[in-house]
Amino acid sequence: VEMAAQAAEARGLKSALISVGGNLRAIGTKPDGSQWSGGVENPWNASDVYTASSSYVSGVNMSDMALVTSGNYQRYYVVDGVRYHHLIDPDTLWPARYFDSVSVLSPDSGAADCLTTGLFCMSLEDGQKLIESLDGVEALWCTTDGQLVTSSGWSSHEKK
């Protein structure tokens, strides 16, 4: 996604919103000058992967920014009543169990994609420390017990 955005910008594109799976990348602002909008799907009320959902836990305004989400609610399979998703904890070699989804806002879609996967596999405390150490990067965690936790600057991007 980031490479597509960079190629488009190199060819003079000033305004676009690229959407690929759970990755959004805004180039500039809308033609009218307003910011692009993105949403973080509610993982506790997510519809089937093939059906559009209108339930969001957060909406954000973006320009020259990426919004990427990783979650356990769309890519999974069930064996003997147990759901296994695709985000594997490198310490246990089993699906990570800290969160239902993690979203990252970053100027770089590739970095945001890496961060969502990494944050999904680490404790909230460690993830918060990491995000707060990065300039221009914010995160939203949807915990397995139904809480929303955000980094210190997430609210400055939220739609009012």
Show which residues each predicted segment covers.
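Mature catalytic core of soluble alpha/beta enzymes
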Residues: 1-160
